[in-house]
């Protein structure tokens, strides 16, 4: 007879871990106990040595489906120390300080789906069905350990039947904290109307069927929903949301419905129908003009559509119910928020912000503690490539194997904000918060930071934030009453890539994005950095240009196009002639831009790769303006991909090799990626009538060549052979592939993002990593 004390670390709360341990104990023939300590699960296993060994093997090989075991510590203990166990017991949770891991929300499982549609089951058509394998977790959590009294489900006492299941180790709902049924659980209702329960769901389905727009409260917030096959309904939603072109997310009935509209491989199907159920960016199928299905206005001008499957029971009931209403296979399911505001999470917010955007609001009385937007995932070389990390993924920690000790908070960026809490080598990136230009989103950030500090039981020693002095994220960090460390935007991008890849040594960082405040007070965005956790050196950048017009230049790429042409020609008349041929703008508009350039009026020096893409999109006549962030740049990428797909013959330009200024350095001896000759080539070929798609492809290839060449020169100088690629421009998969392949041909080790976004949604991780190193050095 032996006794072992076992501690299991990882995602072990809210995933049915203790019931699984109890079943394994029974199968192995051992006695003992299991207790949720908060940071870990503690198990005492007593029995014959072979039985205890069998139990441990089961634990390692057959953990709960949704668990993530990071480590298992075992030690032998003496029987007299803890006594003899007569049976195996699940002990009530205890609160212990230490490593904490919080489970994200989990999509409805197959077993619950079957029960929900079984007329004989007592949870038939129950909008809140769940079990130990699925249901809300993070979004209902007040504190740890994860028990019902510390969630928003504490307001719903279990009925005798649910309590019986909850207490029975033989059931799937043993110790399932959100367990409930139609008799004791939350209830759906229409705000401002009498319909509740079944009547509310039927009224919602009928409204969607008839072409209306509804707001629906889900797990992490509200969605705005309409029939995605109804052109009139989708266009009306676009008008109400003032969203003329930005793609809407779609929810499909099932996998087969997705395959009718999109190309889906095995990896994508597994993720699409997995327990996290993010929005996947999938390639549209080519369809005939008269085919039915998704209407064109869902994702206009985009070869992909963002699509997901229902992950909450109430969403499944929208597609299938027993009321005889024939519902479409596809619903628009876009975040329920007013422009610029965070996703709504309660009735007050929904009524105030969504009433003017929809015809009905379907809500429920289970409170959402933490907002969680849908995660968005692209694919690159057959692997997931995260665009927005939120529901289903946050707050799973990123582990960095550095000998760090301490607690830090990073406030993140101004756009696509997430924040990050670092505890030693574990970094908890929050769900998506949003753009902080709106004070409502700033308030949401402050509230969520406070709740996370409570959940993770941390008291940060320092707060990290962006270098920009006027960012709201900077203000949030400064108001925390902690020592503040400020990190340059693009340096934080590179550190986030290093942290995700657990890279400890120095890298050449290629940070390409739209904007970031530089250490010299100018706008950066096309940077080559030499970086590690101690600091960075700016080794190179895109050739600086004037960004004319302030913030509006980010929406009107033609302005930067005129500026770039003028910078290349150094002649007003010649510039105006080229602008006229390209039909970039009117003559008066051109004259204004040139005058502003001469006087440096409302003009800032910039090295922004994002704005360069916008300008080239305008020069090639693809997009001169953007109605949403990245629209012109995305259109340029799609044009280049279309060219590559057709395998047209490439006529290589005689680019910068003939530029006499190609090898010139700036005063601080910074490597400059010269773009003047490339702009000249593109304008000349476009006026000659060369296809825009072909020129878009050439632009991508030549920019990739400039990056590769720059990294090669930096390696020669520094002997650093590892390159990290980060920043929102690297969401452009064509550029990413061209750069990665170019670097690999030069025998570089290349790091890129995977499940941490390359965009500003990931920089909080880099900020937190720097702050942690800052603590170690006692700065």
Regions found by a protein language model. Give the residues of each.
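A contiguous, well-structured pocket-lining segment that forms one wall/lid of small-molecule binding clefts
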Residues: 178, 185-187, 413-451, 563-720, ...
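Internal gly/pro-rich beta-alpha loop/helix module
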Residues: 62, 165, 323, 327-402, ...
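Glycine-rich phosphate-binding/hydrolytic loop that grips phosphoryl groups
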Residues: 491-512, 516-518, 557-566, 701, ...
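Conserved phosphate-binding/catalytic loops in two-lobed NTP-binding clefts
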Residues: 466, 481-493, 721-724, 733, ...
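A phosphate-binding glycine/aspartate-rich beta-alpha loop in the early core of alpha/beta enzymes
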Residues: 76, 159, 221-286
């Amino acid at each position: 007879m032996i006794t072992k004390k076992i501690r299991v670390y990882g995602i072990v709360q809210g995933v049915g871990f203790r019931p699984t341990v109890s079943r394994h104990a029974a199968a192995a023939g051992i006695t003992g106990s299991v207790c949720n300590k908060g940071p870990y699960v503690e198990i005492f296993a007593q029995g014959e040595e072979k039985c205890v060994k069998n139990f441990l093997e089961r634990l390692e090989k057959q953990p709960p489906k949704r668990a993530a075991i990071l480590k298992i510590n075992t030690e032998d203990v003496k029987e007299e120390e803890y006594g003899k166990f007569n049976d195996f017991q699940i002990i009530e949770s205890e609160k212990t300080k230490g490593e904490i891991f919080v489970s994200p929300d989990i999509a409805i499982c197959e077993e619950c789906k079957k029960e929900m549609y079984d007329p004989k089951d007592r949870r038939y058509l129950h909008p809140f069905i769940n079990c130990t394998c699925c249901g809300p977790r993070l979004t209902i959590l007040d504190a740890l350990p994860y028990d019902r009294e510390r969630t928003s489900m504490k307001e719903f006492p279990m009925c005798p039947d649910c309590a019986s299941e909850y207490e029975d180790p033989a059931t799937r709902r043993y110790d399932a904290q959100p367990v409930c049924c139609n008799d004791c659980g939350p209830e759906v209702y229409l705000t401002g109307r009498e319909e509740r329960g079944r009547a509310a769901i039927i009224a919602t389905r009928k409204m969607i069927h008839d072409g209306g727009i509804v707001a629906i409260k889900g797990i992490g917030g509200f969605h705005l929903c309409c029939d995605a096959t109804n052109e009139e309904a989708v266009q009306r939603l676009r008008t109400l949301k003032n969203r003329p072109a930005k793609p809407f997310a779609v929810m499909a009935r099932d996998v087969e419905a997705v395959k009718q509209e999109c190309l889906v491989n095995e990896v994508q199907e597994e993720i699409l129908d997995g327990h996290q159920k993010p929005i996947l960016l999938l390639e549209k199928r080519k369809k005939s003009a008269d085919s039915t299905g998704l209407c064109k206005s869902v994702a206009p001008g985009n070869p992909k559509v963002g699509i997901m499957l229902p992950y909450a029971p109430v969403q499944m009931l929208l597609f299938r119910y027993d009321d005889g209403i024939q519902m479409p296979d596809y619903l628009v399911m876009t975040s329920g928020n007013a422009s610029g505001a965070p996703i709504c999470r309660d009735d007050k917010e929904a009524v105030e912000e969504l009433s003017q955007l929809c015809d009905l609001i379907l809500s429920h009385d289970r409170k959402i503690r933490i907002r969680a937007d849908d995660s968005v995932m692209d694919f690159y070389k057959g692997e997931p490539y995260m665009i927005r990390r939120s529901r289903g993924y946050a707050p799973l920690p990123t582990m960095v194997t550095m000998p760090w000790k301490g607690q830090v908070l990073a406030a993140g960026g101004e756009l696509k904000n997430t924040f990050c809490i670092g505890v030693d080598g574990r970094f908890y990136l929050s769900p998506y918060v949003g753009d902080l230009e709106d004070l409502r989103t700033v308030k949401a950030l402050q509230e969520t930071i406070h709740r996370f500090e409570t959940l993770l039981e941390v008291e940060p020693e320092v707060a990290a934030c962006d270098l920009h002095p006027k960012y709201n994220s900077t203000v949030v960090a400064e108001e925390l009453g902690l020592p503040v460390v400020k990190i340059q935007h693009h340096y934080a991008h590179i550190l986030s890539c290093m942290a995700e890849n657990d890279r400890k040594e120095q890298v050449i960082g290629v940070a390409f994005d739209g904007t970031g405040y530089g250490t010299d007070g100018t706008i950066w965005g096309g940077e080559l950095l030499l970086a590690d956790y101690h600091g960075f050196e700016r080794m190179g950048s895109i050739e600086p240009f004037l960004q004319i017009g302030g913030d509006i230049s980010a929406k009107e790429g033609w302005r930067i196009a005129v500026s770039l042409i003028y910078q290349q020609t150094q002649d007003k008349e010649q510039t105006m002639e080229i602008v006229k041929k390209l039909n970039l703008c009117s003559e008066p508009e051109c004259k204004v831009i040139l005058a502003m350039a001469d006087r440096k009026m409302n003009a800032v020096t910039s090295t922004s790769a994002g704005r360069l893409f916008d300008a080239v999109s305008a020069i090639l006549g693809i997009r001169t303006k953007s109605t949403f962030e990245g629209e012109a740049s995305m259109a340029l990428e799609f044009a280049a991909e279309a060219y590559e797909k057709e395998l047209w013959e490439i006529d290589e330009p005689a680019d910068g090799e003939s530029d006499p200024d190609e090898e010139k350095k700036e005063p601080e001896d910074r490597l400059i990626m010269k773009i003047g000759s490339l702009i000249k080539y593109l304008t000349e070929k476009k006026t000659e009538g060369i296809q825009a798609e072909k020129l878009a492809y050439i632009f991508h290839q030549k920019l990739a060549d400039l990056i590769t060449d720059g990294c090669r020169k930096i390696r020669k100088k520094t002997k650093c052979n590892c390159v990290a690629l980060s920043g929102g421009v690297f969401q452009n998969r064509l550029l990413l592939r061209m750069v990665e392949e170019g670097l690999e041909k030069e025998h570089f080790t290349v790091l890129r993002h995977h499940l941490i976004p390359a965009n500003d949604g990931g920089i909080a991780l880099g900020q937190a990593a720097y702050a942690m190193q800052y603590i170690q050095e006692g700065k």
